Amino acid sequence: MADLQKIVDDLSSLTVLEAAELAKLLEEKWGVSAAAAVAVAGPAAAAAAPAEEKTEFTVVLASAGDKKIEVIKEVRAITGLGLKEAKDLVEGAPKPVKEGVNKDEAEKVKAQLEKAGAKVELK
């Protein structure tokens, strides 16, 4: 049981980019794809969405604009990522910055990023 707790602790300490890399490595090793499960579940969720008000939002950085350094600083402040990870996220736009947040939090993050000069979308 202690081994399982150590694995949980190790996984919890990964950055977003490290977790994404781990997912890719596991997909390759096990011969599976997480995208297939998402694609199957996607249309069913989309059909149900119009009936209810959306409660969870994803803040997507569409582009960094002219003030890339300011946007990188804001992304670091919002996500807690390191400098390299935040720079990679900003340069790889469009990318999600925050996922599964409520409307107020999403609007707050959007305002912070737009103030820094970024173009942001809420999904």
UniProtKB/Swiss-Prot annotation:
Q: Which Gene3D superfamilies match?
A: 3.30.1390.10, Single helix bin
Fetch the SUPFAM superfamilies from UniProt.
Answer: ClpS-like, Ribosomal protein L7/12, oligomerisation (N-terminal) domain
Looking at the Swiss-Prot or TrEMBL record, what is one Pfam family this protein matches? Ribosomal_L12
Annotated GO biological process? translation
Q: Name one GO cellular component term.
A: cytosolic large ribosomal subunit
Q: Which UniProt keywords apply?
A: Ribonucleoprotein, Ribosomal protein
Top-level taxon of origin? Bacteria
Q: Which GO terms describe its molecular function?
A: mRNA binding; structural constituent of ribosome
Task: Check the record and name the NCBIfam families matching this protein.
Answer: L12
Subunit comment: Homodimer. Part of the ribosomal stalk of the 50S ribosomal subunit. Forms a multimeric L10(L12)X complex, where L10 forms an elongated spine to which 2 to 4 L12 dimers bind in a sequential fashion. Binds GTP-bound translation factors.
Q: Say what the protein does.
A: Forms part of the ribosomal stalk which helps the ribosome interact with GTP-bound translation factors. Is thus essential for accurate translation.
Q: What does the similarity note say?
A: Belongs to the bacterial ribosomal protein bL12 family.
Identification of the protein by name: Large ribosomal subunit protein bL12
